[in-house]
C-alpha cells in the first residue's frame, strides 16, 4: 500500500473499517452539499507563486495560548475515536505530542480524560458540548482541569443533532442497526480483532465515569439525543467561566456577528467551522466564511478554522484566508484507522512537508508572512476570486 496523501488513508480506511464506522466519519448532513463544498471551495483558493526569495531559513513554528506549536495545526475533537483504532485517543494523542502540536479530546471519546492525559508530555485540550445535564458539564470541566488540560474547546453549533441520512443506510442508526453492525464487524476481521476484541471497553469513558456505569453505542446515541440543549445562549457561557479559568475557544462560528459576540464575551479564540458539514447542510463552507470573520475580529481574538482541510497546502490556504491555526479532523482519523499512531504521525509529517513546499513557493519564510497578500485576488478585492459571492448568472 502506497501512502502519499490523506486521500490514500481515506481509501485504506474504507477497506479496513466496518461501513457504519467509515460512513459515520466520512458522511455529512442531509444531501452533503456543505461537506463537498468545504473541500471544493478550499481547493479553488489560488496562491501567488513567488521565486528567488532565499527560503533557506523557513520555519513553521507558531505560538497559540502561550503554547509553542511546531506548526499551526491541532488535532480536532472527534467522537468515538477509540472505535477507529485500539484505544484510538491514546494513539492519536501520542502522535500529536511527538509532533509538538495539541490533541483535543472529545466529550464523547472512548478513552476517558484520565486515561489519555498521563500518556503525553504536553497539555491536551478538552472539548465540551452544550448539554442539559449541567452536572455532567461541571464534572467534565473539573476532571479536565485536574488532568492538566490547558484549553477548553466549547462546541456551540450542536444544540440539536444534524440529520445525517448516511448513518441510517450504513447501520449506525436505523432499523436493525445493532445486527447490521455485528455482521459488518464479522466481515472486517482486521478491525474486529484489533478494535472489536482487543480495544475494549467500548463505552464512552468520560460519560461512564460520571454515570457510574458503562455506556455502549446505543446508550451514546440515546444519551446525546436527550441531552443536547437548544436553550443555550451567551449567558450560559458565563456559567462555564465559573469553572474554567484557562483559555476558552468557541467552536462553530460562521458569522462575523457571532465572532464579534465571542470577543465581547471574552473568549480567547474561535473556530470557524460548520462541524465538517455534519450539522446544517447548505451553510457556507469554512473557506467562504473565514475572510469576513477575519476582517471583523482579526487581532482581537485567536482564529482557528476547520472543515475541508486535507493536506498542508490547505493549511496554508486557510492561514492566508485569515486563520491563525487549523484543526485536522477526518484526515487524521483516516490515518488512525489505517495504521494507528504511526499512521497519524506519518500524516502529520506529510502535512509538514506540504506546508514547507507551499511556503517555499509563495515566498513565506514564517507563518506570520502568510497573509491575504499570498492569494491571487480579483481586481484588488480582498476576497479571492474563487470564493467571491456568486452572481445571478453563476447561480443559474
Swiss-Prot record:
Compartments, record wording: Cell inner membrane
Pfam families: FMN_dh (PF01070)
Primary location recorded for the protein, binned into one broad class: membrane
Gene3D superfamilies in the record: Aldolase class I (3.20.20.70)
Sequence positions that bind FMN: 106, 127, 155, 251, 306-330
Catalytic activity annotation: (S)-lactate + A = pyruvate + AH2
Keyword Cell inner membrane: yes
The entry's keywords: Cell inner membrane, Cell membrane, Flavoprotein, FMN, Membrane, Oxidoreductase
Cofactor(s) listed: FMN
Source organism, top-level taxon: Bacteria
Domain FMN hydroxy acid dehydrogenase: 1-380
Job of this protein: Catalyzes the conversion of L-lactate to pyruvate. Is coupled to the respiratory chain.
Protein name: L-lactate dehydrogenase
Organism per entry: Salmonella paratyphi A (strain AKU_12601)
The organism's taxonomic lineage, starting at the top: Bacteria, Pseudomonadati, Pseudomonadota, Gammaproteobacteria, Enterobacterales
Name of the gene encoding the protein in the UniProt record: lldD
